[in-house]
């Protein structure tokens, strides 16, 4: 069990999880707000 915890806390595994989470978040944001690149943040 300790070996599994050590493996899951290594940088490639954490980076894969983080980038997957970030990609999913960006996909969902773009689904609800499709033209974010042309959206002005300076109201």
From Swiss-Prot:
<dbReference type="InterPro" id="IPR036062">
    <property type="entry name" value="PSI_PsaJ_sf"/>
</dbReference>
<keyword id="KW-0793">Thylakoid</keyword>
<dbReference type="GO" id="GO:0009535">
    <property type="term" value="C:chloroplast thylakoid membrane"/>
</dbReference>
<keyword id="KW-0934">Plastid</keyword>
<dbReference type="Pfam" id="PF01701">
    <property type="entry name" value="PSI_PsaJ"/>
</dbReference>
<dbReference type="GO" id="GO:0009522">
    <property type="term" value="C:photosystem I"/>
</dbReference>
<comment type="similarity">
    <text>Belongs to the PsaJ family.</text>
</comment>
<comment type="function">
    <text>May help in the organization of the PsaE and PsaF subunits.</text>
</comment>
<feature type="transmembrane region" description="Helical">
    <location>
        <begin position="7"/>
        <end position="27"/>
    </location>
</feature>
<keyword id="KW-0602">Photosynthesis</keyword>
<keyword id="KW-0603">Photosystem I</keyword>
<dbReference type="InterPro" id="IPR002615">
    <property type="entry name" value="PSI_PsaJ"/>
</dbReference>
<dbReference type="GO" id="GO:0015979">
    <property type="term" value="P:photosynthesis"/>
</dbReference>
<protein>
    <recommendedName>
        <fullName>Photosystem I reaction center subunit IX</fullName>
    </recommendedName>
</protein>
<keyword id="KW-0472">Membrane</keyword>
<keyword id="KW-0150">Chloroplast</keyword>
<keyword id="KW-0812">Transmembrane</keyword>
<keyword id="KW-1133">Transmembrane helix</keyword>
């Amino acid at each position: 069990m300790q070996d599994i915890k050590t493996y899951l806390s290594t940088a490639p595994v954490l980076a894969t999880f983080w980038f997957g989470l970030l990609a999913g978040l960006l996909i969902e944001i773009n689904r609800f707000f499709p033209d974010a690149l042309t959206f002005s943040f300076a109201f």
